[in-house]
A protein has these predicted regions:
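Bacterial N-terminal signal peptides
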Residues: 7-15
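Thiol-/selenol-based redox modules, centered on thioredoxin-like
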Residues: 130-156
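Short pre-active-site segment immediately N-terminal to redox-active cysteine/selenocysteine motifs
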Residues: 49-51, 56-60, 124
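N-proximal helix/coil linker or "cap" segments that precede and/or mark the start of modular domains
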Residues: 15-32
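Short, internal strand/loop/helix patches
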Residues: 84, 100-129
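Positively charged n-region of N-terminal signal peptides that target proteins for export
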Residues: 1-4
């Protein structure tokens, strides 16, 4: 009986915990990505129609896999999408890993103080948020699940 009650209690608590896992809601404005430094000075020049904010940490192999996928997506979508990779790690540590991903469509924000991670209340990585030109969340979740089709569908 105790196991049944415990299981029931956990089942009821999980959706509440998941709902508060990230500090954003679809259709609502998200915090701005304001950082003091960008890897190799790669601050985005202009705000494109869509921006994907990707939260990254080098200790997670899935983060690197998600960057490979995001590079393929930006190659396909071109100027429609700009990816901002946000990391709390210092430049010396992540530069060798992230520099190969830098392009006209991918920038790396150095959030060493963790302000952006905190503003979005990021609880796991890889995690990302697709944002429109008015800074509203269109999609969020595990970056490995993001596809060009989801981006096209979300932006209509």
């Amino acid at each position: 009986m105790k196991k049944v009650l415990l299981t029931l209690l956990l089942a009821l608590a999980l959706p509440v915990a998941a709902a508060e896992a990230q500090n954003i809601a679809l259709g609502e404005r998200v915090p701005e990505v304001k950082v003091p430094a960008w890897l190799r000075g790669g601050k985005p020049a202009a705000t494109p129609r869509l921006t994907y904010v990707e939260f990254f940490h080098s200790s997670n192999p899935a983060c690197t896999a998600s960057l490979e996928q995001l590079r393929a997506i930006t190659d396909k979508l071109g100027a429609k999408l700009h990816v901002v990779v946000v990391t709390r790690e210092n430049e010396e540590k992540i530069a060798p890993l992230l520099s190969p991903f830098l392009s006209r469509h991918i920038s790396v924000a150095l959030d060493t103080g963790g302000r952006i991670f905190s503003a979005f209340n990021v609880q796991y990585v890889p995690f990302g948020v697709l944002v429109d030109s008015r800074n509203r969340a269109l999609w969020m979740g595990n970056s490995l699940q993001l596809t060009p089709e989801i981006i096209e569908k979300s932006s209509k």
